[in-house]
């Protein structure tokens, strides 16, 4: 985080285009256009700035799909952003990014999350400090080996031009990050996750971020195209709702993006659009041995090298 030369407008323009491209593509896939909710922080609020929330609820394929763009600034980095770098505590900041979570109706189609972001810390009389973060991860309810392999292969290929070491490092980071410590289990089958990324300089770091964001549809669309017409019943929906409970637990207890948004006075509706619309908890529930539900735990919710 030593290179202070950056082009925030270039990042902003790309993020806005990425949000539009993904929303248009997924809206066409569903047959339902995304609604757009433009928002702006009022004068005197803790944060300045605004964004666009693209939301689809009760669609033909997606039960809930949210794609948010935000560009906000504040006077002091919240604890969730500065804990790992105490020297930046109290600095002003600008944070911009696109974050999405997609919840299909069909339990055979996985939930997916993707985020790409830029954060700039500022202090009067000192050079600004920037870094990129992001990634994508897949949360299946019924596991398919070829889907997990395709998702990870696409992530690896997006990172390959920027260093052969990035995918193994970001994959391991993702496995460690999306882990429910109180359950001793991962949230899903992972993907890639990175933060504090700026060492190659702005141009190369931004190019890597673009490669990740632009790979999202390649990673996810072939999976849902293949699984969308698999029949399912109430038992599968019940298991999906039960596993979605883990998603809620992670997002509200551990997720740095959620905590950053809430701690910084972010827009609650946009922050919590990642929540699944139907979810349940059961006391000490265990899957029947030999079932597809049991196989999710034994074969997919374990550390694996998918590619």
UniProtKB/Swiss-Prot annotation:
Recorded family membership? Belongs to the aerobic coproporphyrinogen-III oxidase family.
Q: What species was this sequence derived from? A: Paraburkholderia xenovorans (strain LB400)
Any idea what job this protein has? Answer: Involved in the heme biosynthesis. Catalyzes the aerobic oxidative decarboxylation of propionate groups of rings A and B of coproporphyrinogen-III to yield the vinyl groups in protoporphyrinogen-IX.
Classification via PANTHER family? COPROPORPHYRINOGEN III OXIDASE, MITOCHONDRIAL, OXYGEN-DEPENDENT COPROPORPHYRINOGEN-III OXIDASE, MITOCHONDRIAL
Q: Where is this site: Important for dimerization?
A: 182
**Segments of this protein annotated with the region Important for dimerization:** 247-282
Ligand binding (a divalent metal cation): 103, 113, 152, 182
Gene3D superfamilies per the UniProt record, alphabetical: Coproporphyrinogen III oxidase, aerobic
Q: Which GO terms describe its molecular function?
A: coproporphyrinogen oxidase activity; metal ion binding; protein homodimerization activity
One annotated Gene Ontology cellular component of this protein: cytoplasm
Assembly description? Homodimer.
Keyword Cytoplasm set for record:
yes
Q: What class of enzyme is it?
A: oxidoreductase
Upper lineage: Bacteria, Pseudomonadati, Pseudomonadota, Betaproteobacteria, Burkholderiales
Q: Which cofactor does it need?
A: a divalent metal cation
Give the protein's recorded name: Oxygen-dependent coproporphyrinogen-III oxidase
Q: Subcellular location, in the record's words?
A: Cytoplasm
Name of the gene encoding the protein in the UniProt record: hemF
Q: Which residues cross the membrane?
A: none
GO terms under biological process:
protoporphyrinogen IX biosynthetic process
Residues binding substrate, per UniProt: 99, 115-117, 265-267
**Pfam families (alphabetical):** Coprogen_oxidas
Q: Which residues form the active site?
A: 113
What catalytic activity is recorded?
A: coproporphyrinogen III + O2 + 2 H(+) = protoporphyrinogen IX + 2 CO2 + 2 H2O
EC number(s) on file: 1.3.3.3
């Amino acid at each position: 985080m030593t290179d202070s030369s950056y082009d925030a407008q270039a990042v902003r323009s790309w993020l806005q285009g990425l949000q539009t491209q993904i929303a248009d593509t997924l809206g066409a896939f569903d047959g339902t256009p995304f609604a757009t909710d433009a928002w702006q922080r009022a004068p005197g609020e803790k944060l300045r700035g605004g964004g666009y929330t693209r939301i689809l609820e009760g669609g033909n394929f997606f039960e809930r799909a949210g794609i948010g763009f935000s560009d906000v600034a504040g006077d002091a980095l919240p604890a969730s952003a500065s804990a790992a770098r105490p020297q930046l505590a109290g600095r002003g900041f600008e944070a911009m990014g696109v974050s999405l979570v997609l919840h299909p109706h069909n339990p055979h189609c996985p939930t997916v999350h993707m985020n790409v972001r830029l954060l700039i810390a500022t202090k009067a009389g000192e050079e600004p400090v920037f870094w990129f973060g992001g990634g994508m991860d897949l949360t299946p309810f019924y596991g398919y080996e070829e889907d997990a392999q395709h998702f990870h292969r696409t992530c690896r290929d997006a990172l390959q031009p920027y260093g052969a070491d990035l995918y193994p490092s970001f994959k391991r980071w993702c496995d460690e990050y999306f882990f429910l410590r109180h359950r001793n289990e991962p949230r899903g089958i992972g993907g890639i996750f990175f933060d504090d990324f700026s060492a190659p300089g702005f141009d190369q770091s931004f190019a890597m971020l673009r490669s990740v964001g632009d790979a999202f549809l390649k990673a996810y669309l072939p999976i849902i195209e293949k699984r969308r017409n698999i029949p399912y019943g109430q038992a599968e929906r019940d298991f999906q709702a039960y596993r979605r409970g883990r998603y809620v637990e992670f997002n509200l207890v551990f997720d740095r993006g959620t905590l950053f948004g809430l701690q910084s006075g972010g827009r609650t509706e946009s922050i919590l659009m990642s929540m699944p619309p139907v979810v349940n908890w059961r006391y000490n529930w265990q899957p029947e041995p030999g079932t597809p539900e049991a196989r999710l735990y034994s074969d997919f919710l374990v550390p694996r090298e998918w590619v």
